[in-house]
Structure formats: structure tokens, C-alpha cells
Design a protein with these regions (language model features):
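Short, well-structured N-terminal submotif of metal-dependent ribonuclease cores
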Residues: 1-43, 55-64, 130
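Acidic, PIN/NYN-like endoribonuclease modules and their adjacent C-terminal/linker elements
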Residues: 1-3, 98, 106-137
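Alpha-helix capping/helix-boundary segments
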Residues: 10-11, 44, 105, 122-123
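A cross-family signal for key residues in well-ordered alpha-helices
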Residues: 12-13, 50, 90-91, 107-110, ...
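Phosphate- and divalent-cation-binding pockets in alpha/beta enzyme and binding domains
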Residues: 23, 47, 125-127
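Active-site-proximal, substrate-binding regions of enzyme catalytic domains
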Residues: 49-77
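Active-site neighborhoods of divalent-metal-dependent phosphate/nucleic-acid chemistry enzymes
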Residues: 75-119
Length: 137
């Protein structure tokens, strides 16, 4: 089974038709078929729900569809991991010039030696520097 760390904005690409790509759809299909497991830090849920909320207020998705998407994503094979909020996380953020919440994704990927599915312009090079594989859209 393929396993990887899933960044929130990568996940949101599944929710907005103009942002989907072959790569994002391929990962979604793997998860839907239970051929993959996505690891996410606890903050991922807040970021995802916030992104859906912004999508509603900006007219990119209607409420009913957003709630349906939220439910469908929650049913995917996910391993939600609470990342300790401590000095180590801050040190990682500073070392790679990342926001602390982005460092939580990097920390999770590094700890479990997993690829990182991300669209973030700062997180991708940080993951490469850390020796991690990147799954990009």
C-alpha cells in the first residue's frame, strides 16, 4: 500500500474543478480504492475546512457540495497524527524557513520516511533538502 503525507492545499485541489490535475486525481483514486494511506497532521482538518469555507464565500463551491466533499474526504483512508508543539517543531521551521504549521507536515514526513504530496512553494524545496520524495500536482 502506498503511503504519503498529504498537504491540505493539495487535498483542496480535489474540491475545485479548475485546480484538479492528473496527478491529484490519480492520488484521489488510489485513496478511494484503498490502495493508499494518507498521513496528515491534526492541523490538516482545520486547514481543509477553512479552505472549503473560503471556497463557499468566494463562490467557488456551494454549501451543499462543500459539506459533501468534507464528508467524502473524511471517509478516505487517513491517519491523523497529532504533532507535538514543541521546541523541536520550531527548530525545524526555522531550519527550513517554514511556517510552524507547514513544518508539521515536514516533521511527519521525515519521522516516517514518507513522500510529501504538496503544492507549497516553500515546502517542496524544504522536503527535497530533507531527502524526501515529492508528489506534485
Amino acid at each position: 500500500m502506498r503511503q504519503f503525507v498529504l498537504y491540505a492545499s493539495f487535498t483542496l485541489r480535489w474540491c475545485f474543478e479548475d485546480e484538479t490535475t492528473e496527478a491529484t486525481e490519480s492520488l484521489l483514486t488510489l485513496l478511494q480504492n484503498e490502495e493508499a494511506l494518507a498521513w496528515v497532521p491534526g492541523i490538516w482538518q482545520y486547514e481543509l475546512l477553512n479552505g472549503l469555507g473560503k471556497g463557499i464565500t468566494r463562490g467557488r463551491v456551494d454549501r451543499q457540495r462543500a459539506f459533501l466533499l468534507w464528508q467524502e474526504i473524511q471517509e478516505l483512508p487517513l491517519r491523523i497524527v497529532e504533532i507535538p508543539i514543541d521546541r523541536k517543531l520550531l527548530e525545524l521551521a526555522l531550519a527550513y524557513n517554514l511556517a510552524v504549521y507547514d513544518a508539521s507536515y515536514l516533521s511527519l514526513a521525515m519521522e516516517h520516511h514518507l513522500a510529501l504530496a504538496t503544492v507549497d512553494g516553500k515546502l517542496q524545496p524544504a522536503a527535497r533538502l530533507a531527502g524526501l520524495d515529492i508528489i506534485a500536482p
